[in-house]
């Protein structure tokens, strides 16, 4: 069923693409660069107004004009194309006078003042060399390298470079009638041009007053400044009306915090805080989300919260530390409240602390790890602690290497009635990797010994208190690379044929007396069939006496860009695989193997042209004629602003049920102002929508707005103590976000990636292991 549906899906996709696009061999034009789709917002540029006049490095003033005269031996008068150059400033005017005794400059007519951070045009200028101040009237100004500009009845610059604008305006809109502007009795701009302050300010839209504030400060540059960030308004059936107003606190150069009150009409008011720190070779952040009382929870008054601590640091060239710890009040917090830390469909929270040493020949890792499992998913074991030691020593023959790996792990269960265990493992052996341009031969022989000490074993269990397991492993993996030049469709290609063969031997041993602590079955895709184990962890080491064959063929163009890749492979068993999996429900391979051979694993990639590409993989059981797993993807991408991704995937027997889903994701830059992002995810087995998301964004050079609609299925992970009233099967909502460019230091809008992130499934860029 899946195989035919997937084949039809692929053929239809290819037909649509081929009808609308030329074949790859006939396409010469490459995709547009991302810049061709960007909105152009050119900033006013001003040339040096004193070209040809040397710069001043001391207190000297240089003046050039058409005419000059001196009055009373103290006032110098200049007329016609006057240019004054002083330290840090330059002035053009029709007329200018300089009083030598008062050290005063007066200028009138077509004044252009050019400072380090600003260009000003005015009718009149007065400057004092004594107190190093400048004052202009009827002025208009333009910040340098910034769209910020405006007008002022009077503009003053003090000795520190701080600008004070009386009866003034500020905007980042370049048109004659700006979409928005601040009109204030006074605006102060810092000397560095990084922030501004407005007093008795009106915020105007199309020159119509919208609201009034007695005072507010705003960043102009990208420097981090304390103040409110943009609020966001949304609605949903679960939260009601939601409003967030983040406040950014620039505590110090290497510390900052964001404090966000989050009002939810159906739940209450939540406080979100994020604290970040950056030190020498150390960085991290602490996130806390706290809701004192959820109005929808009637069973108790307990608070609902999420806390997360992340840290990464190095202590020298050899030592590294890593921490990621999250705790949560209840299993359904992410579903009911939502969080920026995790998606609402996440089933567990990561909790890990790690200290690692990396030497030239020795490596060591000490790790504490746990997973906080949400809902009725299979509980996991804590590793308290997990210690790894590994070493490598080159040999003097056959490019060989001696390798040693050992670990000690203490497994602590989540439930009191579960088995606990200590596991000690060591494996040592020799590897001989030989790699040449046209072939490779990798061989290894190792001896693996594992010791288990298991406690709290229930009566009637097949587990034993102590278990010793010693197994050898032999692995030989070889491959050959053939290539030839191929002329097709009038173009030259390089065609490769890459067969490979692997032999793996591990003797059979009954392991049903060992519990499952960190072991699960791994993917048997094309790359997975060449692994030396079928399982993660060490609780099961599958018996193997098998050959794995595989072949890959590629077509590459003259730029060595991969056009087509086809891979096919399978495991052939020389003897029966008797590793006892009868009681290991988690390790069931869903019919992926029989006593003679595994499922066929295939992988396909086809770059139709520079914009379109198709990829897919499948694991197909030829003996019983069914598909274990498979997926197919169709990707169209001109640049990060224009893309389409169509995906279909199938997995047989996931938790007793098959999974089959199809999804469509698209991002379209309609023009330089409008963009659209949409996503649809459909459960084909249950014939229901899992998620619908549509977002429109309008962006101009000085403001942007995003309006989005989302509807997604709700999980239900309720514990008895947190039963939410009125939880619907689907959560539906609308959100709106407005950005006034230039009032937060950013010159770009929200971006399509942020809209993708709002989707519970997100966007996965095409990734190809062999590309």
Curated annotation (Swiss-Prot):
Gene Ontology biological process: Gram-negative-bacterium-type cell outer membrane assembly; lipopolysaccharide transport
A GO cellular component annotated for this chain's UniProt record is: cell outer membrane
Q: What's one Pfam family the UniProt record gives for this protein? A: LptD
Q: Which segment of the chain is annotated as a signal peptide?
A: 1-25
Q: Where in the cell is it found?
A: Cell outer membrane
Q: Which UniProt keywords apply?
A: Cell outer membrane, Membrane, Signal
Q: List the disulfide bonds.
A: none
Q: Which domain of life is it from?
A: Bacteria
| Major subcellular site | membrane
Provide the assembly information: Component of the lipopolysaccharide transport and assembly complex. Interacts with LptE and LptA.
What does the function comment of this entry state? Together with LptE, is involved in the assembly of lipopolysaccharide (LPS) at the surface of the outer membrane.
- What is the similarity comment for this entry? Belongs to the LptD family.
Return the protein name.
LPS-assembly protein LptD
User: Per the UniProt entry, what species is this protein from, by scientific name?
Assistant: Colwellia psychrerythraea (strain 34H / ATCC BAA-681)
